[in-house]
UniProtKB/Swiss-Prot annotation:
Coiled coil: none annotated. Exhibits a very high intrinsic GTPase hydrolysis rate. Involved in the addition of a carboxymethylaminomethyl (cmnm) group at the wobble position (U34) of certain tRNAs, forming tRNA-cmnm(5)s(2)U34. Keywords: Cytoplasm, GTP-binding, Hydrolase, Magnesium, Metal-binding, Nucleotide-binding, Potassium, tRNA processing. This is tRNA modification GTPase MnmE. Its cofactor is K(+). PROSITE patterns: G_TRME.
Length: 453
């Protein structure tokens, strides 16, 4: 898609399209022909006038045969008072799949083009309605898996992140102006305090480093954690999954090897989205089906974000438990947990936390310990603004460039050497907000949006 604003008209279904997913479906149209297409398809009831930002009631008719396609509400928003700053028409019809698909087909036949993923938001960006951080926040709000992740997305949508990045970029621009003035007119200007310039650059660098750290924590709040529960047979892995989820998700029996395949369950622990993986008990077995389950279990905990190694407190820690712990890949956060504390008398050998999946004893401590192990405090309460991965990469690149600029100062190099990396830092921050952006980057950002946004 070109960086120039488009002059064609686009359309898409803006709501879930799965059958039965909702009672209302919306077809959104944006562009210079939006109102004309609406007038061609929509027959208002009575003598309602076509006023901007007023809701009209009526029917959509097929121009080919006059058949009524759906009973709808129509919302007209004339440019520039719309999300895209183009004229926008929305048909609000009945949910399901058939009627809304037919309505979209009629809109496309009337002259609109099927919108690409994120194209409505891209037009809002290109037309100056919002900067790139706000546009990305829309996508993050839609995909938020927890309340805290949604709150962080709203902070970005409100412009907090844009203001913070622009303030840091302005500080760097001020320093660049001072340095470039000395390069061109040093004899005509008072001497520049190089130490003060370095201090200003270091302050911005430290602020960027903190934003990157916060962004990494927020990424876990957005994407969640995949946590594998592993252990020998009959240590209570399925019971723990059921206890944490609050549902009888997994079958629990006294027979070893009951769980033969991976079970997963999505939940939120202290505001953090978690996917729990209940794995087959690891042991030697001649049962081919159980062997396949064990192989899948090993693959699951090898790729998990964190591993909970569960053992039976009533039996104590064993060499088999030690062998299983050694299978966990280096660098994977590992939490050792002893289950069945309600049955344990004083076992000779213990490790890690003590819980009872049956009674619930210690589960809150387990949740907190797991999040702490992964570098998260409950719900990321200290976070006010959060960069996504693209923004983190750019902020880190800007920080590294500022480090090189300060090194040039320490090496006693002339002013113009300082400015090389300073310009790179300014460019990277501009790419975060969209002040400096390429067409390829823009396409990559908006391609991750859902269609209709």
């Amino acid at each position: 898609m070109s960086l120039a604003a488009r002059d064609d008209t686009i359309a898409a279904i803006a709501t879930a399209v799965a059958a039965g997913a909702g009672s209302v479906a919306i077809v959104r149209i944006s562009g210079p022909q939006a109102e004309a297409i609406g007038r061609q398809l929509f027959q208002p009831a009575g003598k309602q006038s076509w006023e901007s930002h007023r809701v009209l009631y009526g029917h959509v008719n097929d121009p080919a045969n006059g058949d009524v396609v759906d009973e709808v509400l129509l919302l007209l928003m004339r440019a520039p008072r719309s999300f895209t700053r183009e004229t926008v028409v929305e048909f609000h019809g009945h949910g399901g799949l058939v009627a809304v698909q037919r309505l979209l087909e009629l809109v496309l036949a009337a002259g609109a083009r099927r919108a690409l993923p994120g194209e409505f938001s891209q037009r809002a960006f290109l037309n100056g309605r919002l900067d790139l951080t706000r546009a990305e926040a829309i996508s993050e709000l839609v995909s938020a898996r927890s309340r805290r992740a949604a709150e962080l997305a709203m902070a970005g949508l409100d412009g907090g992140l844009q203001q913070r990045i622009e303030a840091l970029r302005d500080q760097l621009l001020d320093q660049l102006c001072e340095l470039e003035a000395r390069v061109d007119f040093e004899e005509d200007l008072p001497s520049l305090d190089g130490a003060a310039v370095c201090t200003a650059l270091r302050d911005v660098q430290q602020a960027l480093d903190q934003l990157v750290l916060d962004g990494q924590q927020a990424q876990l709040l957005r994407d969640g954690l995949r946590v594998a529960i592993i252990g020998r047979p009959n240590v209570g892995k399925s019971s723990l999954l059921n206890a944490l989820s609050g549902h009888e998700r997994a079958i629990v029996t006294d027979l070893p090897g009951t769980t033969r395949d991976l079970l997963d369950y999505d939940l939120v622990l202290q505001g953090v989205p978690i996917t729990l993986l209940d794995t087959a008990g690891i042991r030697s077995t001649a049962d081919r089906v159980e062997q396949l389950g064990i192989e899948r279990s090993r693959a699951a905990f090898a790729s998990a974000d964190a591993v909970v190694l569960l053992y039976d407190l009533s039996r104590g820690w064993s060499p088999d438990d030690s062998a299983l712990r050694n299978e966990v890949p280096d660098g994977t956060p590992l939490l050792v947990v002893g289950n069945k504390s309600d049955l344990a008398a004083e076992p000779a050998t213990t490790q890690g936390l003590a819980i009872s999946a049956r009674s619930g004893l210690g589960l809150a401590e387990l949740s907190s310990a797991l999040l702490k192990l992964c570098g998260l405090s409950g719900e990321g309460q200290g976070l006010l603004l959060a960069l996504n991965q693209r923004q983190c990469d750019l902020a880190a690149a800007a920080s590294a460039a500022l480090g090189r600029s300060q090194q040039a100062a320490r090496d006693g190099l002339p002013w113009d050497f300082w400015t090389i990396d300073l310009r790179e830092a300014i460019r990277a921050l501009g790419e975060i907000t969209g002040a400096e952006i390429t067409e390829a980057v823009l396409d990559r950002v908006f391609s991750r949006f859902c269609i209709g946004k």
